[in-house]
Amino acid sequence: MKVCLLICPKGNDSENLKRIASSCAKGLEENGIQSDILNVSVDTDKRLTLYDYLIFIAEPISSFGKDVTPLLKKFLENAGTVSGKRAATILVGGIRKNATMATLMRIVESEGIILKTSEFISKPGEAKVFASRLNIERNY
């Protein structure tokens, strides 16, 4: 199994999202699952065809806003075959969490990705526990 952790920062980079993604990777590694971390703002030419499961880790553009980075939609359009892949979404920060999560889910599902679970996470420790309990298996 191969998992891709996609961080979606409001700018080009976010240390908090990187820490949460690396904690998720450690949690997945405990279960013997390989993972790669990609930044949708920087790694625009990467393909997601090789991955079995996707985990989107995003933050809202502003504290009161409900939008995530518009680069996510462009990244998914150019990422190869993503339709039918299973995914989880993690939202970090913001005041209007439910509205932001709905926006993130809408973007992910519009590309044909099957959303299995979603979570609001604020600390790297929570991310590690979430990833270690994530049910990632191949469905043939």
Show which residues each predicted segment covers.
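FMN-binding flavodoxin-like domain, especially the glycine-rich phosphate-binding loop
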Residues: 2-140
